[in-house]
Amino acid sequence: MSTTYIPYRLDGKVALVTGSGRGIGAAIATQLGRLGAKVVVNYANASEAAEKVVSEIKSFGTDAVAFKADVRQVAQTAKLMDDAVAHFGSLDIVCSNSGVVSFGHIGEVTEEEFDRVFSLNTRGQFFVAREAYRHLNNGGRIILMSSNTAKDFSVPKHSLYSGSKGAIDSFVRVFSKDCGDKKITVNAVAPGGTVTDMFHDVSQHYIPGGEKYTAEERQEMAAHASPLTRNGFPVDIARVVGFLASNEAEWVNGKILTVDGGAA
């Protein structure tokens, strides 16, 4: 008896999501598991949070495991991919989510801060993509993380973060050519303001005079940046990643999908 094919499902696929112990990464890992994929939940420090994500994914009837790796370190990135393949037997989807945020006027940014941001947001993602190419099955998916501030939305004192994500847009365009020999598609999502712990920590920078308002007031104000007059949440990003990971997204390649509710 043949199994009925269900569009957008990921049954039989193995996915790896970096930085997926919390926030957007956790939502992505959970969504891929909900769609049927087995998931490697990567974390750098928050092991307890990562194990909670693993438990939630397993509740959907699929499998998951948490592996620690700091993707700033290329050797750890390579080992993470090796361990994923050793554990599940193959690898079909790699989502690069790890990142840090930064604010600072150009006249005040230090070399140390520049290196902190670019070592993860840019260099880290480059080598996640390289190792993904080396480890993925033919027809796999690489999905990187950009930002609407890379191109569409300018924020004062946000040059380091915006620039670190702008490089991702160029990577995606060229990687999609390099990965064609293995029929691997390469895309990125570019979230706008998304309500996470990080959002509450830095939302005052995105709203003029934001220091005068409470976190709750800033969140309400941010909702009006979109014509839909609501905030973005991690699940909004995760659903788009789920689509890009599916067979139905095969003809989407080398693209940046902005996910901001029309805010930019």
Curated annotation (Swiss-Prot):
It catalyses: 3,8,9,10-tetrahydroxy-6-methyl-1,4-dihydroanthracen-1-one + NADPH + H(+) = (3R)-3,8,9,10-tetrahydroxy-6-methyl-1,2,3,4-tetrahydroanthracen-1-one + NADP(+). One of its GO terms (molecular function) is oxidoreductase activity, acting on CH-OH group of donors. The keyword Phosphoprotein does not apply. The active site is at S146 (proton donor), S147 (proton donor), Y161 (proton acceptor), K165 (lowers pka of active site tyr). Keywords: NADP, Oxidoreductase. SUPFAM superfamilies: NAD(P)-binding Rossmann-fold domains (SSF51735). NADP(+) binds at I24, D70, N97, R130, Y161, K165, T196. It comes from the Eukaryota. InterPro entries: NAD(P)-bd_dom_sf, Sc_DH/Rdtase_CS, SDR_fam. Its EC number is 1.3.1.-. Gene3D superfamilies: NAD(P)-binding Rossmann-like Domain (3.40.50.720). The keyword Oxidoreductase applies. Pathway: Secondary metabolite biosynthesis. Short chain dehydrogenase/reductase; part of the gene cluster that mediates the biosynthesis of the dimeric xanthones cryptosporioptides. The pathway begins with the synthesis of atrochrysone thioester by the polyketide synthase dmx-nrPKS. The atrochrysone carboxyl ACP thioesterase dmxR1 then breaks the thioester bond and releases the atrochrysone carboxylic acid from dmx-nrPKS. Atrochrysone carboxylic acid is decarboxylated by the decarboxylase dmxR15, and oxidized by the anthrone oxygenase dmxR16 to yield emodin. Emodin is then reduced to emodin hydroquinone by the oxidoreductase dmxR7. Belongs to the short-chain dehydrogenases/reductases (SDR) family. This is Short chain dehydrogenase/reductase dmxR18. It comes from Cryptosporiopsis sp. (strain 8999).
